[in-house]
Amino acid sequence: IAAVICCATFPMWNAYPAIFANLATGNSAIVKPHPNGILPVAIAIRTMRKVLSDNGYAPNVLIMTADTRGDPVTIELLQHPEIPIIDYTGSQRFGIWIEENCAQKLVYTETAGCNGVIIESTENIDGLINALANGLCGFSAQMCTSPQNIHIPEHGFETNVGQISFDGFKDLLVDAINERVADPKRAAALCGAIQADESLAILDQLRNEDKASIALESFPYDHPEFPFARTASPLVLTVKPELRELYNKEHFAPVAFLIREKNPESALANATSLVRESGAISSYLYSSNKAFTEKAKDAFADAGA
């Protein structure tokens, strides 16, 4: 029997492959949704149980168990002696707990990391800015692949339109984000909503940090379909590289750090060091320099990105 633990933001994103892999190999599965995401999981499980039944299989090879924040059952489920397989998607903190306390079982975890972007040079500055703006806005940066830390040389970088300064890059990025969130209808389609009050609390904490400068303030927008939804546009902060305590972990909120690095080599060293310390599910590089690109690919691979 496998336990499949779902996350709050994308309840079935990783659950589907885990469920199908277990059923295909003859394992039953108990699916445990996050308390904030019970309904979509229940709908999916009901549908899959019907498909099993319609095709002559016992539907109880797939069941769901739900809980609440006040009365959780996850740890009890994971530690049950008849659960030898665990598939978990969620916070890094609880993922580490599972890896340390359920090491005798077959454990798969997909948690989070410090996803970094290094900018060394580009032959398409418009494409770079648009891609970053979309990534920072998309799903309000609540995806495990969302970029967070953007490492930029303090003296700027070469582009197809000439040298662009650190501040020039910052202004281009801020303008692109503002363009995407100015219209609530477009903002809602791209950013969606904030799934938990904790994310709004993170924004409040970071915007009040004395050591960071606000390049772009975050604000709520009126969701055209869900008037009571939590919403927030991206918060963009500029920081010095030595202030690692501000950006050396995943902040589960729409926030990005523009890190003023000494040069591309320092940016690469800092970004890969963060991968070693905090992990990274996605790492990004913009460079038209083939030698630097190869160096960065090797460095990220060695760091475990």
Residues covered by each model-derived region:
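Structured core elements
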Residues: 3-4, 30, 64, 87-88, ...
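Short glycine-enriched loop/turn motifs at secondary-structure junctions
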Residues: 59, 80, 111-113, 144, ...
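A structural micro-motif
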Residues: 27, 60, 105-106, 212, ...
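Rossmann-like NAD(P) dinucleotide-binding subdomain of oxidoreductase/dehydrogenase enzymes
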Residues: 1-129
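Conserved C-terminal structural/oligomerization subdomain of aldehyde/semialdehyde dehydrogenase
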Residues: 55-57, 153, 168, 224-305
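Conserved short loop/turn motifs at secondary-structure junctions
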Residues: 36-37, 64-69, 148-157, 187-195, ...
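Short, solvent-exposed amphipathic alpha-helical segments in soluble enzyme
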Residues: 18-21, 102-104, 134-135, 272-276, ...
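ALDH superfamily catalytic-core signature
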Residues: 16, 47-56, 93-241
